[in-house]
């Protein structure tokens, strides 16, 4: 067993010859010598020999007689011949076979050990004392199963964070030579990553979402020149002078919903599905304010349903189960989702044609002075053809309806569950102190979106450089895939994280919460979405109080956290109340 001892000594001490020839060893960082494991080495060696002897004996006992004869003949002829040629003729062949097997096993162990030490040295050379993020305790199979089949993914990330008490952790995934996949829930690190110009969206991740727009490059999922063109084309629509017109439309649509729907529910003393109603209201506001398109009631319900079906398939099912894209024709649900996608594209085409028709009737060839999203898209020459214009319209519908609607629905649900908070907000809104009312409304909105974030997380990004978390001595290496889970971002290291308490935001710094992402890929329509949510909340909470009649259930699909079958009942507040 002299060879084993030589291999062991080689692993313990650095290669002196390599030090002079290879600059890799010539690093300024002092590397500790490995401890003496001679006792452990002898124990492993003896244990391996004992195991080999027992294994060989058991194999021989179980071999058929004719195989035993062949095995003995192999030992006597071939092994004896090789041992004679190597000068080991006096050693029994069976001992040589056991030695060879033992040598291979010990060589594998030593090589693995040396490789591990080399990796540690290289890591120390590159990153110093900063370690990679810790692994989540969830095993590989559980991680894959949850990501592919479960609608409880946000709570899975939250549990992973709680298990190891860390807001940053790695996921165990079975991809050889693949980039590291890291969940990041630390607010400062998330901001640094998203604001870095080298951070880009992961194209494989967003390819499925792009299927909603039939795979055409668009403002939401694309990178590079096409995204810059789309962003530059629609940005003028969100200038303050144009937002005022959108706010006015938001007020009109809200009043119309109150008069035609909410009062009807109250007159009949019946409850209503808050999620469904907010989706229809948001869709109506968006189409009129952004696309100058007034929807009929039947069309409103139909497009709302088609949008939900297409979003669930392409932004969740197909994203997490790639086989559905290849073999989806065999599934009725996929065929239905593709039909919904076609209908959404037809609807977007109608919006585009409707705008052009109005422009022709007005006998105008100039760009409208009151720029809307549709006028920016239709009149811009930055688009190659109408397919890209239609794709951007569809993506505005996808990104601007359900997220905003369920933010409203969840906040109203929490206010109904917390009548004291609702009463304080109503008193502030009906009082004479506008600043206090605005601040309290902001706090309620922040707390509602913190407790019930409308999206499960910020989509996967690929980092363009190493990011260091100095407080935790953690490094996220260049090329890693980053995911920002909302429930970790909004709950980790927060006192009473499951409690709806808007007062926590009074002394909280502005940087403590990301509502609409940040950096160059932030939400282009965030000003319109915030204005809509703020106005609807203020209008409803000032004059009405709500009661929860059915909590329903929570579901994560199409990238949105939805309240399903959640029903509220409204009651008008008397002036003297």
Feature locations, PLM:
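Cytosol/nucleoplasm-facing, intrinsically disordered, low-complexity tails
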Residues: 1-67
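C-terminal helix/juxtamembrane-tail motif
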Residues: 58-61, 68, 89-92, 561-577
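Cytochrome P450 heme-thiolate monooxygenase catalytic core
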Residues: 96, 100, 202-211, 245-406
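Conserved cytochrome P450 K-helix E-x-x-R motif and the immediately C-terminal K′/meander segment
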Residues: 144-169, 346, 350, 433-472, ...
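Central I-helix of cytochrome P450 enzymes
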Residues: 282-286, 344-349, 377-429, 448, ...
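Cytochrome P450 heme-binding "Cys pocket" and the immediately downstream C-terminal segment
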Residues: 421, 526-563
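Conserved cytochrome P450 K-helix/beta-meander segment immediately N-terminal to the heme-binding cysteine loop
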Residues: 484-508
């Amino acid at each position: 067993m002299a060879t084993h001892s030589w291999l062991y000594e080689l692993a313990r001490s650095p290669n002196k010859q390599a030090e002079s020839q290879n600059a890799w060893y010539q690093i300024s960082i002092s590397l500790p010598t490995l401890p003496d494991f001679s006792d452990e080495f002898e124990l492993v060696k003896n244990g391996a020999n004992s195991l080999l002897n027992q294994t060989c004996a058991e194999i021989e006992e179980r071999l058929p007689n004719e195989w035993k004869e062949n095995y003995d003949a192999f030992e006597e002829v071939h092994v004896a011949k090789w041992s004679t040629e190597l000068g080991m003729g006096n050693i029994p062949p069976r001992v040589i076979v056991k030695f060879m097997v033992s040598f291979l096993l010990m060589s594998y162990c030593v090589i693995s050990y040396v490789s591990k030490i080399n990796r540690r040295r290289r890591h120390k050379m590159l990153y110093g004392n900063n370690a990679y993020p810790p692994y989540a305790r969830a095993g590989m199979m559980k991680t894959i199963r949850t990501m592919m089949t479960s609608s409880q993914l946000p709570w899975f990330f939250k549990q992973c964070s709680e298990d190891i008490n860390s807001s940053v952790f790695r996921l165990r995934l079975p991809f050889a030579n693949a980039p590291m996949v890291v969940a990041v829930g630390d607010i400062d690190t998330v901001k640094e990553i998203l604001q870095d110009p080298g951070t880009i969206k992961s194209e494989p991740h967003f390819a499925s979402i792009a299927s909603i727009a039939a795979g055409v490059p668009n403002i939401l999922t694309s990178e590079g020149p096409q995204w810059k063109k789309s962003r530059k084309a629609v940005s003028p629509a969100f200038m303050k002078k144009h937002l005022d017109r959108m706010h006015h439309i938001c007020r009109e649509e809200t009043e119309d919903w109150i008069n035609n729907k909410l009062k009807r529910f109250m007159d009949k003393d019946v409850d209503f599905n808050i999620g469904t109603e907010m989706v229809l209201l948001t869709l109506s506001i968006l189409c009129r304010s952004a696309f100058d398109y007034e929807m009929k009631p039947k069309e409103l319900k139909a497009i709302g349903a088609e949008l939900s079906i297409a979003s669930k398939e392409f932004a969740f099912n197909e994203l997490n189960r790639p086989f559905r894209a290849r073999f989806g024709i065999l599934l009725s649900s996929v065929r239905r989702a593709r039909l919904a996608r076609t209908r959404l594209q037809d609807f977007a085409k109608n919006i585009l044609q409707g705008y052009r028709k109005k422009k022709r009737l007005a006998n105008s060839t100039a760009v409208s002075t009151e720029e809307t999203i549709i006028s920016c898209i239709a009149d811009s020459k930055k688009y190659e053809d109408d397919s890209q214009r239609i794709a951007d319209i569809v993506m505005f519908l996808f990104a601007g309806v359900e997220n905003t609607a369920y933010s409203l629905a969840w906040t109203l649900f929490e206010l109904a569950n917390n009548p004291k908070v609702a009463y304080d907000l109503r008193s502030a809104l009906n009082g004479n102190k506008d600043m206090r009312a605005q601040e309290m409304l902001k706090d309620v909105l922040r707390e509602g979106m913190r407790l019930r974030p409308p999206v499960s997380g910020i989509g996967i990004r690929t980092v363009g450089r190493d990011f260091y978390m100095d407080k935790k001595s953690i490094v996220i290496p260049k090329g890693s895939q980053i995911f920002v889970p909302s429930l970790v971002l909004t709950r980790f290291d927060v006192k009473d994280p499951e409690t709806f308490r808007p007062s926590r935001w009074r002394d909280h710094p502005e940087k403590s919460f990301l509502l609409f992402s940040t950096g160059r890929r932030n939400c282009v329509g965030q000003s319109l979405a915030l204005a809509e949510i703020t106005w609807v909340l203020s209008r409803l909470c000032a004059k009405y109080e709500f009661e929860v009649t059915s909590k329903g259930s929570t579901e994560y699909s199409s990238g949105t956290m939805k309240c399903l079958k959640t029903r509220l009942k409204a009651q008008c507040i008397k002036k003297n109340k």
